[in-house]
Amino acid sequence: MISVYGSTGFIGSHYCDLYNDNVIRINRNTRDPQSKDILYFISTVTNYNVFDNPHLDINTNLNVLVQTLESCRKKYDSDFTFNFISSWFVYGKSTLPAKESSSCNPKGFYSITKLAAEQLLISYCETYGINYRILRLCNVYGVGDKKSSKKRNALQHLATEVVRGHNINLYNDGKDIRDFMHVKDVCRAIDCVINCGEINDTYNIGSGQPNNFFELMSYVKQKTKSDSKFKSVEPPHFHKVVQAQDMFLDITKLKQLGFKQQISIHQGLDEIIETIN
């Protein structure tokens, strides 16, 4: 059994539903683990928190992590494995495809605290002799994300707008590159790393395929015969400062574990379209 922290979030809830017989959902108000295998999803999800609550990323991504590590250590000493969900945001602007060994140069509060959390985790685990794994996720999409917006799960948000015939704005002619993976495939990849991955190691989780927003939204428009029009706009200054324009991941290590993606990007978009219709 694996104790899942952050089981009510978009990815965490999908993971728990997919592997229901093997998970213990940890209440958000407690840090007490119920098994020696830990899967940790708790995190903020955007760099924009700095405008409303600059302490949120630090408190959530660092303080809560330390509290959880302490609870696990006090209960199990060093006899547990901590699987930490991180993000491609830690890379910042990087040579592509980004490898686990690539240098990290994050700029935003969220991105910086995710990298700091990785380093804190490694230091803590090495200090106490605890096993860990770090999983850096690509852009995760799929139906069921009630908080999707231009800043989070933008693919679902934009696809929804196109299906409904609304005009959309695309940064840089929609040519920004991202690595998208359906949430169910992401959960399968996470489970693959947990069961087959080396301990004390880092893994990229993604499709390994570069896609841009213009081509994907054009597919949605053609598929639904939408009247939506696309307008190219200049990204806000803050977006250009904290966000890499292009990103996709090298998933060689994930493939070596035997993982194979099951849902193509077009199949995932078709699912979104069907849900909206």
Task: Describe every region a protein language model picked out.
Residues 1-20:
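N-terminal Rossmann NAD(P)H-binding glycine-rich loop of SDR-like oxidoreductase domains
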Residues 48-56, 93-97, 146-147:
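Conserved catalytic-core motifs of eukaryotic protein kinase domains, centered on the activation segment
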Residues 31-60:
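NAD(P)H-binding glycine-rich loop region in Rossmannoid oxidoreductase-like domains
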Residues 86-87, 119-144, 169:
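Conserved beta-loop-beta element that borders a ligand/cofactor-binding pocket
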Residues 91-92, 108-109, 133-153:
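Flexible, glycine-rich beta-alpha linker
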